[in-house]
Amino acid sequence: MVGAILDQRLMSVHVKEIPAKTIGAILVFLYAWVNQYRCHKYLAGLIKYSLPEKGMFEYLISPHYTCECLLYLSMAIAGAPEGTWYNKTLLCGLVFIVTNLGVTAAGTRKWYVEKFGASAVQKKWNMIPFLY
């Protein structure tokens, strides 16, 4: 009898489909999370005051900042209320993170230029590929 009642209750539970944008946001989150870890691991293993040049550092001054921005972007999308594309509160957090880390990435570029010369970072983007 108890089994029949439980079966009936379990059958009445409706599982909502996960929106494609949420699945995409989760995939972006996982990509950014793994790559940010790789960037931090690489930086931790560098000889003191050497120019990082492998992996994403080949193209970006601060790829770990890029990954951080992607983490916030993916959370803003995954956490969006039903019927909207993004969560406004998390989007505000993203704006703060992009601004804060953008300034820091510019400072990092300046330091690299002083330490290693302009040619060492000439072809690298600060933080956002093809934009900044």
Segments from the language model and where they lie:
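Glycine- and acidic-residue-rich phosphate-binding/metal-coordinating active-site segment common to enzymes
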Residues: 8
